[in-house]
Structure formats: C-alpha cells, structure tokens
Amino acid sequence: MAELTPMMKQYLEIKRDNPDSILFFRLGDFYEMFADDARLASKELDLTLTSRDKDPNKAPEDKVPMCGVPYHASDAYIARLVAKGYKVAICEQMEDPAKAKGLVKRDIIRVVTPGTVIDAASLEDKSSNYLCGIYLDENAAGAAFCDLSTGEAHLTGFTGPDRVEHVVNELGRFSPAEAVLSPGAAEESTLTQALADKFACRVEKGSAARFSLPEAETHIRTQFGEEALKRLPAGNPAAAMALGGLLNYLYETQKTDLSYINTLDYYEQGRFMELDLTARRNLELTATLRGKEKKGSLLWVLDKTRTPMGGRCLRSWLERPLLSVTAIARRSGAVAALVDNTIAREELIAALSGLGDMERLIGRIVYGTAGGRDLASLRAAIERLPQIHAQLASFSDRKLSELTAQLDLLEDVGARIAAAICDDPPFSVREGGFIRDGFDPEVDRLRHILKGGKGVIVEMESREKERTGIRTLKIGYNKVFGYYIEVSNSFKDQVPETYIRKQTLVNAERYITQELKDLEQEILTASERVVALEYELFTALREEICAAAQRIQRTAAALAEADALASLAAVAVHNGYCRPEVDESGVIEIREGRHPVVERMLRDTLFVPNDTFMGEKQERVAIITGPNMAGKSTYMRQVALIVLMAQIGSFVPASYARIGVVDRIFTRIGASDDLSAGQSTFMVEMTEVADILRHATKHSLLILDEIGRGTSTFDGMSIARAVLEYCADKKLLGAKTLFATHYHELTELENTLEGAVNYNIAVKTKGEDIIFLRKIVPGGADRSYGIEVAKLAGLPEKVLQRARTVLRELEEENGVSYAPPRREEDQVCLSAVAEGEVLDALRRCQTDALSPLEALNLIYEWKRKLSQ
C-alpha cells in the first residue's frame, strides 16, 4: 500500500477522534469526505463518488473514494444528513492556506446532530428542537431538555417505581430530536423503545463519567449560576446528573460560546397536568392521529400567532397545562383583557406581525453563526418595540402590565446596529459589503480606493506634474512592473532624486517611488483588507450585542407570551368562546359545549352543542350509550379538550363553563393491533386500561370508549362492568369518568352504582333510515341501531335483509322480542334539538357584519329548521 500523504494522515487522525460522525474535511472551497464517509454521503446526498488518487495503474477498489460539497452550500447538505439522524463533524482550516508553512492546521469547530441544529433553514419556525439528557438508576430518574436555538432549558426528576413512565410522559411534552442517555437509561428497554418508535429520536449512549455528580454540579454552576444549583433537590441528584450529562455533550460537540443558555426552569410533579402519549395522540393536541398534520389539531385552531416565538410559546402551553388555579386565572385574565378591548388587541396583533424570531436571532448571534442579515433583522425587530410597548401599556391587566415592564426597548442595541450595518447586507460576512458607509473611516478610505483606483492615480499624476514641472509625466501600469512613472527623455534631467529608475525605453525612462509602491500595494490589497476589516468590525459589534443577550432574551420572552395571549384572545372572539371559571371544586360543568376542532372543520352544517355536568359526588361517572357514528367519541374528546383549554388559560367553546382542576386526562379511545410488538387489539386495550387504573387519581378525568369490545361478549361486558365499578368507587378511585359502551346492560348500574348516570346520543329513524341528532340526552339507549348504521355505510341490501332475519332469530332464541323500527321514532323532542341549533347559530352570528339580504336568508333558514 502506498504511503499516505501528510493531508490524508491528518484526515485519519481527526476521523479517529470522531468515529461516529461523518467528517466534513475542509479543502479549499470544498468540504471533502473520504472512504466510508464518502460512500455513505454519496448515497444519502446523491453525490458523485470520485478519488484523489489519479494513478491509472491502480484498480478502482484500491483507490480511496472521495466526494465533496462546496463550502458555501454546505448547510443544506449538512441539514439533509442530520435530518436522517447522522452526526456531522465540521473540520475547518484554522489558518490561511496561502500563509501556512507546510500542512494547513485543521480542527473540529463543531459537531452538528439532530438535537444541536441551529441553522434557521433546518428548523420549523413554530416548533422547538430539543436535546434531552436522561439519567436513570434503580431509585430515581432525571430528565433535562435544552433547545440550542433559543437557549431555553428545562429540568425535572422522579423517584419511585413509576419513574420510567413519568420520564416517557415528559418526552411527550418536549418531543426531543436527540437523547443523551446514562448507562442505566440506555439499558431500560421501555425508554429506548419509546425514543425509537414514538419520537424517531437519535440516541447517544453516554458513559458513567459523563453523568458524574461532581462534574454535573460544576457544569450547572458554570452555566446557570450557584443559585440555580441550590434550587435543585439535594436528596435526589438524578435531575442534576441528567442536566450534567446534557451539558457535557454540548461542550463536547459545540466548542463555542453557550452563555446564552443561562436560565434553568426546574419543575416538579404537580406544576403541570401530566398527559401520557396515548392521551396526547388521541386528543390530537398538536398533530392529527392519522396524517400527523397540524391542520385538524387543537393547535391548528388556537394558533393565530404572528411570530415564530409566539407560536412556540403557545405550543408549549398546550403541552404543559397548568394545575395552579392562580396561574390559570392570571393567564385567562390577560386573555379576557385582550378580548374586551378590540381596538387595542387588533393594533397589538398588527404591531407583532412580521416581527421575526428574536429568540433564535440572539441564539445565533451569541453562538457565532449569525450574519449581517441576522443583525439587520434584529435591528428591524427592535425598531418595532416602542409601538408594541405602547399597545401593551394601554391594558390595565396585571399580567399584561408585567409583560410591558419586561419589555426592554433596547434602543442602544438598535442604534448601534443601525449605525454599523447597512439596510440590505449580503448573505455572507466573509465577503464584505455590509458595514454602513460613514461608520468607519478606514473602511470608507479603502472603499474609495477600490471604487476610484484610477482617480487616485490621476490625482497623484497631477500632483507629481505640478511638483516636478514635468508636463509629459504620466503614471502607467503593466503586469511585469506594476505601477510606474514615465518621463520622456527631454525631461529626464528634472527627475527628482526620490525617483528610482526601473526601465529604459527608446524615448523615455520609467521610475517608481516609495509613495507609488505604497499606493500600488493599497490598491492591489484594498479588497482583501476591507473584507478583513469589515469582519473585524462585525465581530466587535457581535460582542457588544452578546453583552446585551439576557436583555434581548427577556424581551423576546415577553413578546412571545404577548403574542400567544393575543392569539388566544383573537380565537376566542372569532369562535364565540367564553371565559371558564376554574377552581378546585372537582366539578365539571359545561353548557352548550362544542368540539373546538370539529366545529371549525364543518362547512355546510352547524355543530350541535351539548351540556356536561360531572360533580364531586353526584354524576361522577357518565355511562354513554348509542349507535356507532352517533358522536359518542366526539363528545368525550370535546369534554377533555375543553378542560385542557381551560387549564392553559384559554377561553373555551361553550356558553358557560366551570372547570374543577384536573391533574391528569386519560384516554382509551379506539384500538389497533400492535403487530410489531406481537400484541392484539384486546391486549393493547387491556394494557392501556391497566395503566390508566394504576396511575389515575380521584382528581383525574377518564375517557373510556368501548372497553371490552375486543373479546367475547360476556368476557367484554364483565371487564367493562368491573372497570366501571372500580372508577366509580371512591374508596378505590372515584375519578370523573366518561364511559361509552355498546353493552346496554350496563345502563342498569345507574340504580346501584353511586355517582353513575346514564346518557345516550339522540337519533331519529324514518322507516329503516336513521338520522344522528348528535345530542346528548339523559337515559340509556334502547337499542344499538347496528343494522341502520350498516346501511349508512353502504352494505348491499341483500346483506342487510339477511342481517335483519338473523337478528330476529337470535333475539327470539334469547327470549327478546324483535321490534322493527317504527315508521318515525324520536328519542328526544326534535323541536328542542332544532331550537338549540337555532339558538346556537344566533349566539355566534356576527350581526354587525351581515347585509340585510344575508340576515333575511338566515331568518328563513331558522324558520325552516323550527318547522321541521
């Protein structure tokens, strides 16, 4: 094998220190990859595989493969690799190759991983990108989360047998892109499987040394200060060790200033409502169950934010509903103030529009990857602050007043950027052209030389003619001698002694002077020098801005919160929501409640509102019967979403709501076979029910849909009844429960089970047709309407006829008389339903926006409904 070149030896040494990363090795204007990295990158990035070895006598397999990307376009390629879960180590030239003596010095400047991405093009504007650190031992667990793009950091810890489940639930809040695991965490299959299957999260297995407590305490003290360390529980170091492991990983991979990560949010159980992954999925808080899309989720309805940071703030509220009645009241009070003052609210929203992402801007500035455009964007945002401050100051609400006080106008920072950076800077700070004219005299002088090099020469030529009296003197240029002074032979006796002869021609002599040599050097190097000087000035300006980083972060946080509050207010007004009363009563009372998402998805029909009452003692458990497709699941989800909305401080889709704080919401809705885990529908269902009964408390809200349907009728009914009795029994659980079932026999429990009450979904039948009225009414359903639903689904008529015959035979065998549907059957007073629909439409009608003709058409439509 041929001896390696010095450059390849250097490459292999650096690669040896970064074996788990794809190494981007800087060579001139390209980042090159070699050997296995080249093969992998060429496949993932569709790059042509070549080789530096041009020896025609070597077989292709003996040549080291190579591929590369232009350095100025590398961000897009790095982003593609990181999005696929790879680590990318960026190896940069640490000195100017033109000035290097021998081999150019190179070193890793950062390692980009899924959890450490800060490039704006690689991130979703309204979603955070978290790196998490998890520590786990036989007694305790800790979970730390950090978004490198904004600097926010969160930390929590757990003890006891359920510590792993709690950590997984926290992962559901943050949806990390990458996890750094302690040895104990890496061995916990429940955790690693959740990271892989539920979050598609890259896992970095750390050593015990990375998570050591002494090192963790040192890192926390350095990064967040002594006070932050003192706030952590001394008796449970797991949280500190999780954060220490995360910080260790950041220091190893980032190799830059991380001082903007300066505020630690430590929280314990009891501060936020805890939601497991099943509840988050079934309630479709941030993405739909099937398409994994934002549209159709609760976030889609509530998010009318005007800034990326406001969108992230609102999303975090949805992920972390509050448990403190006081905190909820303060937030909903701010929303109410915004709802009540239409003009000020709309002016605030207009002022926030297009503000930009100050949180991520200051992150990139401190991190060192910001360009001139980032500084210009920050300046533009700062210029909007006085207007936003004035709008916020017009509200008397306590929460909004606090945000106003938190809003630093940053006039000094904005003025400094405005003075230094031009209005439309180029993309790269390495090419110059972004320092404003007049900011620095030396930059101005060099630019003058660049723009008017010939003019400078002409000025010198005129000056020399006047000084020497040589009328034919001229200054010229050629590639051999550079600039020169040419004097005809008739005047060579007048040449000053300071002129140095350089060349003799037939009719003239050519000279140079020290001044001309200096000027030539300035002209030839002006471009390089002005670019270098501009970068120095940019670096100095960046350091000035970094000194104000915490002020900028506080202001950005206030803006994000104001934006999120304004969004909730705008949605409340537009959708006709009410402010809920939130207390610790244990009561859930909702009048004319609506599903926040379904009502926005309906186009041609009105959503039918429903009432809900669940008391601390009475009506704790609602047994809901009715045909499939009638709306049972929608109703139950509706109640859960209204409770959750109330606990994030939002208004809710109802005419009145009183919500006793709920500590957890559990859902068992629908089921699908988990074939990959070898689990059937029924096994999945029973596992989820077991988890719910093990973790629920009397303060929880349970949404249980069709328990027991995955097995035989009597087994299923027995399990359903036992679960229902367990939920209702205050000595065992006593949780508020919405229990939908197709076992009509369970309706008899209303008479024997304390706190149980029957409800059903009203339907109307005409002949063999069925109409769902979507109305929840007291009492149990008298039949299932299964064949009528099958008809709606489009089963062939022959199948339906045969089904009716079989049903009649089965019911006769069991001593049940078959009663075909009457020609017209109402389970409830239809006029009451129609009146409810009309009243709901009237409440939501924006009369000021209606034309006379539109109003008349509405009246005709309402009259038609009431006459049916």
Predicted features along the sequence, with ranges:
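Charged catalytic and DNA/RNA-contacting regions of genome-maintenance
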Residues: 1-337, 353-366, 370-462
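Conserved catalytic alpha/beta cores of large enzymes that bind or transform nucleotide phosphates
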Residues: 171, 176-185, 191, 515-548, ...
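Intracellular alpha-helical coupling/juxtamembrane segments of multi-pass membrane proteins
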Residues: 328-331, 351, 355, 453, ...
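ATPase nucleotide-binding head domains, primarily ABC-like/P-loop NTPase cores
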Residues: 35-38, 236, 306, 317, ...
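Extended active-site and interfacial segments that coordinate phosphate-rich ligands
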Residues: 38-55, 146-174, 493-524, 604-614, ...
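Short, amphipathic C-terminal "tail helix"
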Residues: 371-374, 847-868
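Amphipathic heptad-repeat alpha-helical coiled-coil/stalk segments that mediate oligomerization
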Residues: 140, 208-221, 273-277, 289, ...
